[in-house]
């Protein structure tokens, strides 16, 4: 948290007094007893049901019966998370996105076990924290954001494999067309703007040629087999030894830093 504040200070979004005041509000404990009286509990453990279930049992032993427990999982359904709980109606998913301390979006997902009151209570708290909340009507693998992302990843990798364009040119198209457009208007707002009739004509031409595979592309399988798994390995779709990593990290956080307007403690 202190390191994250250094980024805010560097960009003129906070001063040292804000950092110090925020740190004073933070309590770190190794005991579940510290959760007694909590309004909401977030669980951000490894994606292992055994680990999560053990945590829920410990949390339920100290919090009120109606205190929501929100998992930050990106993949495990709520109905699997709540199995064996004393009060499964409290269980839900509140899935944030990296970098969590500055990315405003949270996906809020319930299951067949989840009480509407738990969802509403969590929603109200997230809104009070200036989050942008996507409320799913039902749970599906990948929720909303990762389904959209995987659709784009799949088509992008397919175009590389088919020799349509390379990674750099596809990223150029995303950054200066798709990304810029949908940063200020919604995808489906634009669909309505274009109109159903024109979108139908485009779809009839493009849909039959889109990637429809339901397995991981060979380019990914080959990269894993060779140890070329991306940025951390130094080689993936890009040769990262030829890229400015510090510049990449700055660009990765810049859009979110520009949107910060929090009232910070003093």
Where are these regions (language model features)?
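NAD(P)-dependent Rossmann-like dehydrogenase/reductase catalytic/cofactor-binding core
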Residues: 117, 131, 162, 167-266
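Structural/interface elements that position substrates and couple domains in central-metabolism enzymes
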Residues: 128, 149-155
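Rossmann-like NAD(P)-binding element
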Residues: 9-69, 76
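Conserved phosphoryl-transfer catalytic core
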Residues: 1-5
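Rossmann-fold dinucleotide-binding core
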Residues: 68-146
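Short, flexible helix-loop junctions that flank or precede catalytic/ligand sites
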Residues: 135-139, 158, 172, 176
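AAA+ ATPase "lid" subdomain C-terminal helix
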Residues: 150, 160-162
